[in-house]
Each structure stands twice: as structure tokens, then as C-alpha cells.
């Protein structure tokens, strides 16, 4: 009975790195998409464009830095809002880069917004792109408040990442080695008992 507990615990420990790696990608794909949602405030008073974006940052992240660029051409406003986040209980290095960019077109009564959001997870080398096209909102007293929602979501794993390949190889080698050790140990115990 004691031997069976040892076998189960060793196999569990050998499988954990593989499960942790795949679950982190799944967790990123399902939960971190909420980082792209929030409210976008557009205000145009006295020919000055003011854009304010309040992103939704979950409790599990700490905010590091933010950038905002705004360009205007006729009735079009182009903006890019980027921010860097890290996991609260992770390393000091940023683990997520979120970049929200878009085109806002306005007239006297309404504004139309095209928005795309890129989430780059540096820990798992995965990226998610969310896009939204031609959402129209009413313009009230030169202010347009948009609630950002998306039409399509594309998720992909970065191809040129050499560290994940090394990690995958190491995890598989650990799994094979621990399985061989347990198998040899079990055969020796069976041989000694017979």
C-alpha cells in the first residue's frame, strides 16, 4: 500500500509541469480577455480633442506603466493606449502588454468607433487580438462615451519563441525519466517479493 502511494505521488509530480503549462495558456485565453474592456471617453471642446480610457484591470494584476498617443486628421481621431501589467504574485518583470488602438470618426450628432486590442502574454508567449468595427454612439454636448465590446477574437501562440520549446522539452524529459524510475522501482519490488 505504501508503495502505491509513492508511485502515485511521483507520477503526479512528474505530470504537474505539463499540466501547469497548458492550463496557463487556457487561463490566459479565457480570463485575460477582460483586460480589453472598459469605457472610452471622447471629448471635443474648443477644437481640442481629449480621449480618456479607463481599462478594467482585475485584482490579480499590478499596473506598471501606461502610454497614450492621439492624432487628429479632419474628423478622424486615431489613438493608441498601451499599458504594462504584472501578476501580483509573479516576478518584477512585466508579464502582460495590452495595447488598445482605434479610429474614432465624429460629426455633430454621433461618433463611430473602430477598436482593436492586443494582449501579449510574455509568460506563455501567447497573444490575443480582439477587433470591433463601426460601433456608432450618440454625441451629447461634444462628448461621446463608448462601452467597448468586440466582434471577433483571435488567439495564437507566438512561433519564434525558443524558451517555450526548451521548457516543453524539459517537461517531457522529466515526465519520461520519472515514469522510467517508477517503473524500474515497481519491477524490482515485484521481483524481490516473488
UniProtKB/Swiss-Prot annotation:
Glycans are attached at residues 65, 114. It is a single-pass type I membrane protein. GO terms for cellular component: host cell membrane; host cell surface; membrane. Residues 1-22 form the signal peptide. Keywords: Glycoprotein, Host membrane, Late protein, Membrane, Signal, Transmembrane, Transmembrane helix. InterPro entries: Orthopox_A43R. Pfam families: Orthopox_A43R. This is Protein A43. Residues 187-194 are cytoplasmic. It comes from the Viruses. It comes from Vaccinia virus (strain Copenhagen) (VACV). Belongs to the orthopoxvirus OPG172 protein family. Residues 23-165 are extracellular. The chain crosses the membrane at residues 166-186. It is found in: Host membrane; Host cell surface.
Amino acid at each position: 500500500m505504501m508503495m502505491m502511494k509513492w508511485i502515485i505521488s511521483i507520477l503526479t509530480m512528474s505530470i504537474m509541469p505539463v499540466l501547469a503549462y497548458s492550463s496557463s495558456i487556457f487561463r490566459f485565453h479565457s480570463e485575460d480577455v477582460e483586460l480589453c474592456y472598459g469605457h472610452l471617453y471622447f471629448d471635443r471642446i474648443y477644437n481640442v480633442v481629449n480621449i480618456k480610457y479607463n481599462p478594467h484591470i482585475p485584482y490579480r494584476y499590478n499596473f506598471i506603466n501606461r502610454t497614450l498617443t492621439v492624432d487628429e486628421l479632419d474628423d478622424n481621431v486615431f489613438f493608441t493606449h498601451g499599458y504594462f501589467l504584472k501578476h501580483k504574485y509573479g516576478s518584477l518583470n512585466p508579464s502582460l502588454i495590452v495595447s488598445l488602438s482605434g479610429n474614432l470618426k465624429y460629426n455633430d450628432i454621433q461618433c463611430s468607433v473602430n477598436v482593436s486590442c492586443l494582449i501579449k502574454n510574455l509568460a506563455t508567449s501567447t497573444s490575443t487580438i480582439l477587433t470591433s468595427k463601426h460601433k456608432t454612439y450618440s454625441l451629447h454636448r461634444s462628448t461621446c462615451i463608448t462601452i467597448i465590446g468586440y466582434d471577433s477574437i483571435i488567439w495564437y501562440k507566438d512561433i519564434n519563441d525558443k524558451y517555450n520549446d526548451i521548457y516543453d522539452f524539459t517537461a517531457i524529459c522529466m515526465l519520461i525519466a520519472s515514469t522510467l524510475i517508477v517503473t524500474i522501482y515497481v519491477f524490482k519490488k515485484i521481483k524481490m517479493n516473488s
